[in-house]
Amino acid sequence: MRQFTAVVNPTAGGATSAAALLGVARLLREAGAGLETEYSHSLAHARELARRAGERDRIVLAVGGDGMAGGIGGALSGTGAVLGLVPAGRGNDFARALGLPTDPAGIARVLLDGEPRAVDTIEVTSAVHDRTVVLGSVYAGVDALANHHANSARLLRGTASYYAGALRAVAGWRATGYRVTVDGTEHAFTGYTVVAANSGYYGFNRLIAPAAEVDDGLLEVVMIHDAPRRLFFTLMNELGTGAHVHRPQVRVLRGREVRIEADRAIPYGADGEVDAAVPVTARVLPGALRVLSEPGAAS
């Protein structure tokens, strides 16, 4: 029977994470699986706990949102250890990209009977990140600023916090000159953001890169050019379906390595964590992580 180690950060949405784990834990134990729980005091500590558990050949459960999934998944990338996801955050974008359930019974089913699926990860290099590995996307611009505001929100949750953060970010945003180098070819433009996406979803289930696949060895590079604010909000609404990619203000490229530079120190984010400014380089690591997925979904 499978042996699990759940890593929970009690200081980051801890009540929600603990509640999500409770129902799943009961079902795992009733099925005869072994489960131990580790509580982290920071994302760096969570990564270390995950590495130790993986070294003991335990399946490591990331309990929380995309920041926790990205941190723990990044720590396990390239190690051969297996990751299980217990979605309990505001976005859960990477779990959504994998088609994972969010109800306790569905989560437990995948953890007990699912198959490890090899997925790509992203290596991030900047003045702050020294080859840090994340799962979903790296984005630089107004969306990173919106994400920062959403993370700081105290009264709002989920999509409401993201939209409030976006309104605040866009209101004070000025067009930025970007230099985006994709596999050695430079592309210059003025605009709102650049997203290097492994997962199609980001920003609380917004479909930023509809063609992105987590196991194709490529990053989708979405560049949103300068546009009137009214049109930008239309683009934001179209992120729900991915229809924005058909707009002339949106350009999509593909590549294995993406470097993002700008004419000012704009923020960038990675899997919901915003703590640095460009320049930043994102490089895909093909098939570097094994994640438990629905039976039959393994590649």
Predicted regions mapped to residue ranges:
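Glycine-rich beta-strand-to-loop/alpha-helix junction loops that act as flexible
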Residues: 10, 63-65, 86-88
